[in-house]
């Protein structure tokens, strides 16, 4: 089920800008590759990449791409319903629940994703790959796989009370 980005009040954040080169006979052709995260700070977040000769054009393309890849994030109050490990390539991000007032404890690119997803109290630890693309996509993977107690009860055909015991 795709989420329509036009109905959301999206904010965007440039996570990483990389200058890439194509070596040709006459020298090097430089381009810019940009990684952007978009989110409404209310449970929707997406990531996209864009490439162009000029940075503003690359950012525009990345934002367009990110709007096509928006996922819904399940939350319980200001945190995540349970701990989860998101994986992408060799990058792993462990997203953990936190008490109210903790804030967002996460490094670099992961922090941007969690803040734009609307999470206020959450901890994250990244393992493996330090590549911003892998870290951001691993975070998105983890957030997309989150489930609330209500979701699990519905899947099993039981009530929430039966699940919680």
From Swiss-Prot:
Keywords per UniProt: Ribonucleoprotein, Ribosomal protein, RNA-binding, rRNA-binding
Gene3D superfamilies: 3.30.160.20, 3.30.230.10
One GO BP: translation
Pfam family, one: Ribosomal_S5_C
Similarity comment: family membership: Belongs to the universal ribosomal protein uS5 family.
UniProt note: domains: The N-terminal domain interacts with the head of the 30S subunit; the C-terminal domain interacts with the body and contacts protein S4. The interaction surface between S4 and S5 is involved in control of translational fidelity.
SUBUNIT field: Part of the 30S ribosomal subunit. Contacts proteins S4 and S8.
Record's protein name: Small ribosomal subunit protein uS5
Species name: Clostridium botulinum (strain Hall / ATCC 3502 / NCTC 13319 / Type A)
Lineage of producing organism: Bacteria, Bacillati, Bacillota, Clostridia, Eubacteriales
Gene: rpsE
